UniProtKB/Swiss-Prot annotation:
A Gene Ontology term for the protein's cellular component: cytosol
Gene3D superfamilies recorded: 3.30.530.20
Protein name (Swiss-Prot/TrEMBL): Phosphatidylcholine transfer protein
Function summary: Lipid transfer protein that promotes intermembrane transfer of phosphatidylcholines but no other phospholipids. Binds a single lipid molecule. May play a role in hepatocellular selection and transport of phosphatidylcholines during bile formation.
Phylogenetic classification of the source organism: Eukaryota, Metazoa, Chordata, Craniata, Vertebrata
Keyword Cytoplasm belongs to the record: yes
Organism of provenance: Rattus norvegicus (Rat)
Metal-binding recorded as keyword: no
Gene that produces this protein: Pctp
Amino acid sequence: MAGPAAHFSDEQFREACAELQKPALTGADWQLLVEASGITIYRLLDQSTGLYEYKVFGVLESCIPSLLADVYMDLDYRKKWDQYVKELYEKSFDGQMVAYWEVKYPFPLSNRDYVYTRQRRDLDVDGRKIYVVLAQNISVPQFPEKSGVIRVKQYKQSLAIESDGKKGSRVFMYYFDNPGGQIPSWLINWAAKNGVPSFLKDMVKACQNYHKKT
């Protein structure tokens, strides 16, 4: 049986790096959604789904890039600090790591789950150390859909991190997520507007409490 295909090209990693230096917001109808606590979020309507793509820019103080990247990649640790995680783990299929992630949704909505692959690269770009993580949904028979949980079949995320020149990190994040089902648009917008800054704050706190396992 063929394994899940690799999704990430060198160009995708370069594009994420480039956004840190010069955000690519021209040539499309990117709208400013929110600007607060050092975090700026833009959104772009995806015509095919009626949902939005998001770009997030900001500085996370008191968390150095290498630590932030380690915390982001550590799924076991995320189960301790992310209150919305119900289940999260990785398995290897034909030499490629595949992650399973179930997210708690508020009643009466059904939980969502994701099956995705991800890759981290620590890059040197013109003397700048940049940590990039790319993630995208895939379909593998080893993770069939569960009864009562809605499978997210469109999910894509990019994260790029570099030093802010002090003791913090400059961050770029792109994500698109089609949660499926009948979720009111106001709730999706609220989650993007409030959930992302809240997640980043939680991640900074997680960095401060993180002790890398040896």
